[in-house]
């Protein structure tokens, strides 16, 4: 690793519609090839679908989905004496949010609805109710950590 000064964290501006930093980060997570306006259209379209379909506040659904998908622990590979162990470690808050966004995005992409906005809305509504592909992924990661609890003393 370089021994230069530590790079400062960049402040992310809140999104223009809701004034929320988390939504802005999610738009950036959805974005492909720098096409931010397309990503915004997808996310805001999904929020509109949530409003019409569920009759709920899209920000509440989004935050509920995020909190249900965020992992508490994950496993990291650690080499000890010629053997690789999957060591359970706690997830940092910033990484929790990043993983939750990534899992929401990937499980939305795997869905069968017509547009990405519809897929994203359906995935967020399901995640808010503790079901769906992203929640399944979180449970899988938690199960792996639980199964390898015996190696927790190898923590980094």
From Swiss-Prot:
Read off the Pfam families from this record: Ribosomal_S7 (PF00177)
Query: What Gene3D superfamilies does this protein map onto?
Result: Ribosomal protein S7 domain
Which Gene Ontology cellular component terms are annotated? small ribosomal subunit
Species this protein is from: Dechloromonas aromatica (strain RCB)
Question: GO molecular function of the protein, one example?
Answer: structural constituent of ribosome
What does this protein do, in the record's words?
Answer: One of the primary rRNA binding proteins, it binds directly to 16S rRNA where it nucleates assembly of the head domain of the 30S subunit. Is located at the subunit interface close to the decoding center, probably blocks exit of the E-site tRNA.
Upper classification of the source organism reads: Bacteria, Pseudomonadati, Pseudomonadota, Betaproteobacteria, Rhodocyclales
Which domain of life does this protein belong to? Bacteria
Q: Name one GO biological process term.
A: translation
**Which family is this protein grouped under?**
Belongs to the universal ribosomal protein uS7 family.
Name of the protein this chain belongs to: Small ribosomal subunit protein uS7
Q: Which UniProt keywords are listed?
A: Ribonucleoprotein, Ribosomal protein, RNA-binding, rRNA-binding, tRNA-binding
Record's subunit section: Part of the 30S ribosomal subunit. Contacts proteins S9 and S11.
């Amino acid at each position: 690793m370089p021994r230069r000064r530590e790079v400062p964290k960049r402040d992310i501006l809140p999104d223009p519609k809701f004034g929320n930093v988390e939504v802005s980060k999610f738009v950036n997570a959805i974005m492909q090839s720098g096409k931010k306006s397309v990503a915004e259209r997808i996310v805001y379209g999904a929020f509109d679908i949530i409003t019409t379909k569920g009759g709920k506040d899209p920000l509440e659904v989004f935050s509920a989905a995020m909190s249900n998908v965020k992992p508490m622990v994950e496993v990291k590979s650690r080499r000890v004496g010629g053997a690789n162990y999957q060591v359970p470690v706690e997830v940092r808050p910033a990484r929790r949010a990043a993983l939750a966004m990534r899992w929401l995005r990937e499980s939305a992409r795997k869905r069968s609805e017509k547009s990405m906005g519809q897929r994203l809305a359906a995935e967020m509504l399901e995640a808010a109710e503790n079901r769906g592909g992203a929640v399944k992924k979180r449970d899988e990661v938690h199960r792996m950590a639980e199964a390898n609890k015996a190696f927790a003393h190898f923590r980094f």
